[in-house]
């Protein structure tokens, strides 16, 4: 959430804010700033963050940027809202050289909420207390890493019983599985972390590796219903099924699922059926598959032109029979799987003005989702929202008429956004990765 820094001050959600000071009559009424649409910033103006729009906001840097990450479910409990928060991320870097890459475990803790501005009547003693409080409120980051040859395109984490593992797509064309238990242990204790980085990290190797894709890829998803079952898709249009075997290994079916004609961009297992999954592709299609059929005949449903161009990302709702997709056309589309044969989405939203890079349904609220785009925006949406005809916002600023009613919030300030995830155990908490680093935030809207 940002506002113009200058004589006018507006917030990104389209709610005009009072001018800070000065005579604005010569400028006419305040205008809402719509990211990617204007009005353009004038000389001397810049966007500044409106901290009152955030319950919590933190940023983190890891050196080389991360193209992908996943949130690691922990044993700290569900529905955590009490601050400060603790969370764990597994991420992979995109470094300048292949040998400089790392698979990382991040422990972020002491994450406090945004601090209210000081009152006008605060005295010197209160200011000293605030300084002490500020020191205690500093966020903390522990980072354990292991060498990885090649940039990491995608990371997805799953628990195999009590064992956390990460599936890792490498730009070198391999898909690897890494055990994460040791990394989770050492980020809890500074001395253990120092010993690990000194003596152990170079020896950590994947517990399984598959090089049968004949090229790199990005699509990867663990089944939420069948422990250890994995799908991987590559830029050569092939999708392979991984089946866990006794002894902690996998059998990878060498027969690819046949249907797409270009790169497979994303994969999502059904949250309700063990054998069904969805895929999207640079061929503009979305397909629904059933692994009980032979790979050459497993495609059951197809929407051939789901977007005008590449379909980059999909997310299958855990609570409703809805599939969410985002494409190079900047559109977000909702597909009712009960009507998928019709080939038409039940809703289309066009807020992003560049390719959509990530989408995800809220894990607890069935109508809420988030998306990120190459236009440096993260948007939050709620399908249940309808504009109040008596509110008068549109009359106050006609620019609001173009905003979708379901748009809750627009977050900016990141550069080259790549991926976002809701925290499954901390309601409303979003984490994103971009060239500018990680951002952890919760807005007043969700």
From Swiss-Prot:
Q: Which GO terms describe its molecular function?
A: chromatin binding; DNA replication origin binding; histone binding; RNA binding
Please describe what this protein does. Answer: Histone binding-protein that regulates chromatin dynamics and minichromosome maintenance (MCM) loading at replication origins, possibly by promoting chromatin openness.
Q: Which PROSITE patterns match?
A: WD_REPEATS_1, WD_REPEATS_2, WD_REPEATS_REGION
Which Pfam family is one of those matched by this entry? WD40
What quaternary structure, including any partners, is listed in this protein's UniProt entry? Interacts with METTL18. Interacts with CDT1; origin binding of GRWD1 is dependent on CDT1. Interacts with CDC6; origin binding of GRWD1 is dependent on CDC6. Binds to histone H2A-H2B and H3-H4 complexes.
Q: Which Gene3D superfamilies match?
A: YVTN repeat-like/Quinoprotein amine dehydrogenase
Biased segments, Acidic residues type? 121-135
Sequence segments annotated as region (Disordered): 1-38, 110-141
Broad class of the protein's primary localization: nucleus
| Annotated positions of the Phosphoserine modification | 119, 122, 344
Q: Name one GO biological process term.
A: nucleosome disassembly
Q: What is this protein called?
A: Glutamate-rich WD repeat-containing protein 1
What induces the gene encoding this protein?
Induced by E2F transcription factors.
Compartments (UniProt record): Nucleus, Nucleolus; Nucleus; Chromosome
Q: Which InterPro entries match?
A: G-protein_beta_WD-40_rep, Glutamate-rich_WD_repeat, Histone-bd_RBBP4-like_N, WD40/YVTN_repeat-like_dom_sf, WD40_repeat_CS, WD40_repeat_dom_sf, WD40_rpt
List residues, modification Phosphothreonine: 10
Keyword field: Chromosome, DNA replication, Nucleus, Phosphoprotein, Repeat, WD repeat
Superkingdom classification of source: Eukaryota
Any Gene Ontology CC annotation: chromosome
Q: Which organism does this record belong to?
A: Homo sapiens
């Amino acid at each position: 959430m940002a506002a113009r820094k200058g004589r006018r001050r507006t917030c990104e959600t389209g709610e005009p804010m009072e001018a800070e000071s000065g005579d604005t009559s010569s400028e006419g009424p305040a205008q809402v700033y719509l990211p990617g649409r204007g009005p353009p910033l004038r000389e001397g103006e810049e966007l500044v963050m409106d901290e009152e729009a955030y319950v919590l906001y933190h940023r983190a840097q890891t050196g080389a940027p991360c193209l992908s990450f996943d949130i690691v479910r922990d044993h700290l409990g569900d529905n955590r809202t009490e601050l400060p928060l603790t969370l764990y991320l597994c991420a992979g870097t995109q470094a300048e050289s292949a040998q400089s890459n790392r698979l990382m475990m991040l422990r972020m803790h002491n994450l406090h909420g945004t601090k209210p501005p000081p009152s006008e009547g605060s005295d010197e003693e209160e200011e000293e207390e605030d300084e002490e409080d500020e020191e205690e409120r500093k966020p903390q980051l522990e980072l354990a890493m292991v060498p990885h040859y090649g940039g990491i395109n995608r990371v997805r984490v799953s628990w195999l019983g009590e064992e956390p593992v990460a599936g890792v797509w490498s730009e070198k064309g391999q898909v690897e599985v890494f055990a994460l238990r040791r990394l989770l242990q050492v980020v809890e204790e500074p001395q253990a972390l120092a010993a690990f980085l000194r003596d152990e990290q170079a020896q950590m190797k994947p517990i399984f590796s598959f090089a049968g894709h004949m090229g790199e890829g990005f699509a990867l998803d663990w089944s939420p219903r069948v422990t250890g079952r994995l799908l991987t898709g590559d830029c050569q249009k092939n999708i392979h099924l991984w089946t866990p075997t006794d002894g902690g290994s996998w059998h990878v079916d060498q027969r690819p699922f046949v249907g797409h004609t270009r790169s497979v961009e994303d994969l999502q297992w059904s949250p309700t059926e063990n054998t069904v999954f969805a895929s999207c592709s640079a061929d503009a299609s979305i397909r629904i598959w059933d692994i009980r059929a032979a790979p050459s005949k497993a495609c059951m449903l197809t929407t051939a032109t789901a977007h005008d161009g590449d379909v980059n990302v999909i997310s299958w709702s855990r609570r409703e029979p809805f599939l969410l997709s985002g494409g190079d056309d900047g559109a977000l589309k909702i597909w009712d799987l009960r009507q998928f044969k019709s080939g038409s989405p039940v809703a289309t939203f066009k807020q992003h003005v560049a390719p959509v890079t990530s989408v995800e349904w809220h894990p607890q609220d069935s109508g809420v989702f988030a998306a990120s785009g190459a236009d440096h925006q993260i948007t939050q949406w709620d399908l249940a929202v309808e504009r109040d005809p008596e509110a008068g916002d549109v009359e106050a600023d006609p620019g609001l008429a173009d905003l979708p009613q379901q748009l809750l919030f627009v977050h900016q300030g990141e550069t080259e956004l790549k991926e976002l995830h809701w925290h499954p155990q901390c309601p409303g908490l979003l984490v994103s990765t971009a060239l500018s680093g990680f951002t952890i935030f919760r807005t007043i809207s969700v």
